């Protein structure tokens, strides 16, 4: 597996994962809009045949990074792909000069919360009713980004 920037040929694979992972998936257009943005890193985890195993979207603006979206194909979860994507987001955040990375995660997504906590993310708050499909709360987690993270 390798982590690389998204390309146009990855979009079908990203959309397939997005649509099975989230009740209200991002549109194809939302991903396409991110391609040219200087402050955005849209990454894919690619397998041996260059198939998309997972992806992440992270923005770095004004010294902070926001991990907006991350998903791994359901058949490949538990293999460390999500961890690798988050690690690469942290590395790129450090290289971009961010001092903090934060994210929102569904309050009921225990597996994701365990992963983030194991990577040094800490609880910072709750966004009540954040997810419009169910009204579920979002838990806000963040982590300091250190200069040493750039070398990961």
Locate each region found by the language model:
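Acetyl-CoA-dependent GNAT
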Residues: 2-77, 86-96, 144-151
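Conserved SAM-binding loop
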Residues: 3, 78, 104-105, 123
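Conserved G/P- and acidic residue-centered "switch" motifs that form tight phosphate/ATP-binding loops
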Residues: 80-82
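Short glycine/proline-centered loop/turn elements that form peptide/ligand docking sites
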Residues: 86, 109-112, 129-134
């Amino acid at each position: 597996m390798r982590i690389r920037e998204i390309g146009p040929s990855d979009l079908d694979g990203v959309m397939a994962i997005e649509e099975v992972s989230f009740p209200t998936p991002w549109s194809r257009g939302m991903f396409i809009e991110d391609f040219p943005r200087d402050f955005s890193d849209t990454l894919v985890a690619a397998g041996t045949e260059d198939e998309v195993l997972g992806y992440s979207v992270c923005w770095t603006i004004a010294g902070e990074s926001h991990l907006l979206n991350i998903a791994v194909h359901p058949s490949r979860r538990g293999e460390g792909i999500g961890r690798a994507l988050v690690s690469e987001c942290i590395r790129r955040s450090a290289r971009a000069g961010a001092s903090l990375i934060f994210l929102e995660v569904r309050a009921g997504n225990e597996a994701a919360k365990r992963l983030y906590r194991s990577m040094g993310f800490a609880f910072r708050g709750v966004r009540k009713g954040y997810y419009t499909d169910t009204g579920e709360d979002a838990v806000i987690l963040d982590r300091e980004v250190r200069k040493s993270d750039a070398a990961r």
